[in-house]
Amino acid sequence: RLVLLEQQFMGLEKYDRMDPNRVCFSVMYNDSYMYSAGNHTGYVVGTMNELCNLEKFSTTSIWGPAHEVGHSYQTKPGLCWLGMTEVTNNIHSLYVQTSFGNQSRLLDKQGDYTSIYEKSMCMYFVRKRAHIITDSDVNVFNQLVPFWQLYLYTKAIGQEDFYKDLYELIRINTDQDTPGKSQLEFTFLASKASGLDLTEFFVKWGFFEPIDIEKSDYSKGQFVVTESMIDETKQRITDLGLPKPKG
């Protein structure tokens, strides 16, 4: 069920793109804990007591395998540009976690904040941080919040297929050649998939902050978003002629 949920979430079933191959879950006898590789996901033998216990697997232990399978299904670079490797796979993790009836991990306490949500809103809404930056104040779970909020909002207004349609748009459109362009293209395609002008949403969450930094994400690269790139993307969204979200 875990694998099927992730496949359905990204529109593989809806758009007749289901993979005929199975997802391989391998037991590993080393110290790698859990990981995703090109042809399998691996789990150290010490985790078997939890992963092979149905009650634990479907509750406290669901995040790990959902996270690793999420890596296997990440769509690069459209929804996995530089800096998002340990972020956007967790959209899948959250979907699986909550689909199994568990509380969202984003409701967990974070430091002095009542939840990851609260700290994230402080970091982005109040401090006006660029979404791509991580440090002692912001981690991958804070970066995850806007992606999950898109799911929750579109679901609340009856758009159950938002991410299915967004993934399909990412699959059929031309990949961008830089991480910064990929981030901005995501804002455009998300607006298109939702039928809503999401400019203000992405402004609040730091996607439209100009930045030029070296970013480390397993490999290193330059992450550049300029004012002119931002202006061009905002205009493209405006040209879609979409209404703004309500509420």
Task: Enumerate the predicted regions with their spans.
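Alpha-helix initiation/capping motif
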Residues: 44-48, 62, 159, 210, ...
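Non-catalytic terminal regions of proteins
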Residues: 216-247
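Amphipathic alpha-helical surface "interface" segments used
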Residues: 23-32, 170-171, 221-228
